């Protein structure tokens, strides 16, 4: 991808921050990337997309705010976007909670860019697919994708705020599909070269082979080993349900009234850290506030939630750098959650379990009860019975209906390695495998 560069965004900002408003904020993106899909053990699609987006927030009469979006940085298009934002602001009721715009700031250093990933060709992604296919026997089909993306983000405010960052990302997902079983593995990194595609393929194939002819299993409460992808599903839903300042202030969060109290097992520490070396975040949020590391759960104790400028003003706090793009009705969200690893390997977690289930990942997950953090969803791509400390056989998929906070209160072991998942939200979560007692499955399937 050829970068537009900060100067190109500055040209657009000079127009968007024009006269006729009390204050203005410009948020612009440039993203480009390639995707190589494969199914039935062959490549069936190569795509390339490149997008430009710009959002202009106009403020009139002190606290009447309008936001308009466009898809071009050309001068006439930017002027049109500004005029639309001004027109919206003119008919929008005053917002007494508007905190004003962020001012200039310095941002933490972050190494987010990799030239080789930004310049990846379809042939290079195809080579990765070929290396994955080498791990597949003839009686198991391969499916999945390899994707590489490069991004620019720019923020400018009439306060003098300027923020600019470039980043790359590479992801690989591999499914192994047998006659009546399947396996799955994935990896997301900053650099394409950090993806070990053959290892992912090998993991997926082993799951499909072990899962052949899955046995029936009764619903009920089980000791489960959740692999990192399944753990991440719980984390990402908790981000949405209660780790944000708006839900906290409105009393919808499981953290409301619990700060300083033990609400999870002591083995559980959860932080949001956008600028960790293995995270996928940015050094600033979409309001231009510097990103910061926030400890949410510390050894089972509720410590804090994340804040943007609006919720921080209401709470008498400082923004933690977790604002979303305007217009934002959700409030702040932690988009780079991580559960700190423990001291047991996945093999040790399994070996310590007399009877239970191992879950590779969940899908079709959703919220049953927001305040109680009850979730439901299905197991997928590798659910196995554990007997006498060993994986005994594949079992048919199950529906879980489980209080997520309760599950993290019942953790008996935490894996010593973490993996990144990007299933639900922009950003991602990094989590280990966990061993949970009394995890509730409400129904079984026939496959």
Where are these regions (language model features)?
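N-terminal small-residue-enriched
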Residues: 1-447
């Amino acid at each position: 991808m050829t970068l537009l560069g900060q100067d190109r965004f500055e040209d657009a900002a000079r127009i968007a921050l024009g006269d006729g408003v009390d204050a203005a904020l410009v948020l612009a993106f440039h993203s480009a990337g390639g995707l190589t899909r494969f199914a039935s053990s062959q490549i069936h699609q190569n795509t390339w997309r490149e997008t430009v987006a710009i959002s202009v927030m106009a403020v009139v009469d002190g606290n009447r705010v309008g936001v308009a979006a466009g898809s071009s940085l050309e001068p006439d298009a930017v002027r049109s976007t500004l005029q639309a934002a001004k027109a919206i602001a003119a008919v929008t009721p005053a917002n007494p909670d508007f905190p004003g715009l962020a001012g200039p700031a310095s941002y933490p250093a972050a190494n987010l860019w990799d030239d080789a990933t930004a310049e990846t060709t379809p042939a290079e992604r195809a080579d990765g697919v070929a290396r994955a296919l080498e791990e597949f026997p003839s009686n198991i089909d391969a499916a999945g994708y390899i994707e590489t993306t490069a991004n620019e983000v720019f923020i400018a405010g009439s306060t003098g705020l300027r923020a600019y960052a470039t980043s790359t990302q590479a992801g690989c997902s591999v499914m192994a599909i047998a006659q009546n079983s399947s396996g799955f593995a994935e990896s997301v990194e900053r650099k394409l070269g950090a993806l070990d595609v053959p290892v992912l393929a090998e993991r997926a194939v082993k799951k499909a082979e072990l899962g052949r002819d899955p046995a029936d299993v009764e619903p009920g409460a089980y000791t489960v080993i959740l692999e990192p992808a399944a753990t991440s599903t719980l984390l990402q839903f908790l981000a949405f349900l209660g780790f944000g300042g708006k839900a906290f202030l409105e009393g919808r969060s499981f953290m409301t009234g619990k700060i300083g109290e033990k609400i999870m097992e002591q083995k559980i520490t959860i932080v949001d850290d956008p600028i960790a070396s293995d995270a996928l975040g940015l050094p600033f949020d979409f309001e231009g506030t510097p990103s910061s590391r926030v400890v949410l759960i510390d050894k089972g104790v509720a410590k804090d939630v994340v804040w943007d400028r609006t919720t921080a003003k209401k709470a008498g706090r400082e923004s933690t750098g977790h604002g979303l793009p305007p217009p934002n009705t959700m409030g702040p969200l932690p988009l780079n959650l991580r559960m700190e690893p423990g001291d047991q390997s996945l093999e040790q977690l399994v070996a310590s379990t007399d009877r239970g289930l191992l879950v590779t990942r969940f899908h079709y997950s959703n919220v049953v009860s927001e305040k109680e953090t009850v979730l439901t969803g299905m197991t997928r791509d590798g659910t196995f019975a554990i007997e006498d400390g060993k994986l005994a056989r594949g079992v048919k998929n199950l529906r879980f209906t489980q209080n997520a906070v309760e599950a993290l209160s019942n953790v008996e072991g935490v894996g010593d390695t973490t993996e990144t998942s990007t299933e639900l939200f922009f950003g991602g979560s990094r989590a280990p495998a966990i061993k949970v007692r009394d995890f509730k499955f409400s129904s079984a399937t026939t496959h």
